[in-house]
Amino acid sequence: MSEKASEERPIRLAVLGGTSTGKTSLVSRLTVNIVHEVHYPTRNQTNWLFGFVPSSILARAILDEQAHERLCLRSPSSQTLEPIFPSPQVSKNVLLSPLVFQASTDNFQSVRLHNKSHSRRSLSLDKSDSPLYQTFSNDINSQSVPKIKADQLNVIEHFKLPLNYIPPTYAPIQIDIIDTPGFSPDNVVPFLEVSLFRNLGKSILHGLADEPRRPVSTTSLLVASGASELNGKVDGYILVYSAVPELNHIGGPPEYGDDVMNTDTENVSDGGFELLKVIRNCILDAWTEFRNYEKRWEEGKEDDIYSLVYSLRHLWSKNSKEKSAKIEQLRSYNTKLKSIELDPSSPDSPPPCIIVCSHVNHELASPMLIEMGRQLATKWKYGFVGIDSMDDLNVDVAVSLLIKEISEKMKLLVSNSNGSSSSGNSSSIYNSHLMNDKKKNNNAGLNKNMLKKIIK
């Protein structure tokens, strides 16, 4: 393992979805490469720390920072350079997000313009790797490519990469993946904790504070008091639903007194697809609360505004009216929050998400559900991957796509922060894994100089 990778904290990913959607199977395939045929419901939140090494051709191609440089160096000068991904729809089960596809298109345009003004021999692969992962040389990866698995994936997925392109192999990428129980909207409070020792008050929990033994206060998927793992340190979310409609039921079984004619049409079997909208809304609400908290903390960090000594000391100071108004504003509890910025170039935007449809190779898989997932990903500007953990189909592609999304978001944030600092503005800069930690002298974060290399 490289020294750079060992000094940084791992990428933290959270897997969210309904019951029986294949979340644990996905995590098991990634971590121990074993998937149980018998379904064992996940009751408690579980963390897995492992070294992720993408093996399939598509997963390695998605992570490649210099894909078109490699293709150009291996292609004859008489051959026209073609894009690695001519369309976001890479295959029937893989859809690139706009951010990742734009990065690939920009790389293609850059190499093509370089070829018009320089010879291909002037191209090099000495550009620094992404701060999240490192590549090996082509000599190594040409010997270690799993040919059988790659050929099988080509046949199954029907995607075509340029013949002269060989994606690199990668050093293990340290990932902390969080496996969660089935998502229950009734047991989730959309709020992100700052640390393990911060408890939610009655003004936020309301009636839930009167019953501390309820699951919402102990095993919430997202944010309830004590859920320290799913806090503001999460770098990306994997939203999972199943292509088999019968595997997840919304609303549970009917009651004895239910009338068939008056049954709610939403209480249908859809593999947990409708839950994705609820999960996304909870994530956005939680990060909206968290960003507002950060801004209010930044405004009042110079002094302890809740201290009696602070109030007495500034009682007769100048501009006391303005300061008093500011203190009252910071102390107040806001019932209406500003909407969160969804642009990935904004440091206030939530972490990247991808939609994963499991069980796509199952005999009962619904093509309509798979297509609905693609359409929803297009609407939300997310990436989409159809996987099958039993057959190990696209499991590493899903993780690679999310890591690439995080890496590209980092580039945007670093580029924007450099632009704002040159103009005199002191905007917030977020460190490694992007959006969660403020830029400080933290040994667990990414090196600032390393971040600047990726935009040269």
From Swiss-Prot:
This is Uncharacterized protein YPR084W. InterPro entries: P-loop_NTPase. Residues 415-444 are annotated as: Disordered. It comes from the Eukaryota. It comes from Saccharomyces cerevisiae (strain ATCC 204508 / S288c) (Baker's yeast). Residues 415-428 have a biased composition (Low complexity).
